[in-house]
Amino acid sequence: MKRHNYSVYMIASKSRALYIGMTDDLERRMFEHKNDMVNGFSKQYRCHRLVYYEAFDDVKRAIDREKQFKRWNREKKDFLIERLNPTWEDLAADWFKRHRYEPEKQVPPLAS
């Protein structure tokens, strides 16, 4: 039987507009948000920074947690984020950087 993984996440803009969502593939979903592939609030307010997330193996628990977060006032959401991520760093900042080949030392040119 395949094990399912679900994530409830909060993403923020530079001005700290906050979007809350739920997905079964957080890496794919963050790629979509970061590249403005998701129409709506997150695209309009440029919410590209993953500032908080929780993982679940049960979809109902994930949906319930997302709904709970959405009912919370802003102060409570900020407190939760800042407890674990006080500077609102992008937790997915390095997920999509391309790897470049960087040799440790230069190879000498071939003699002509």
Language-model features: where?
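GIY-YIG nuclease catalytic motif and its immediate N-terminal context
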Residues: 1-38, 43-49, 53, 63-67, ...
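Short arginine-rich
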Residues: 68-80
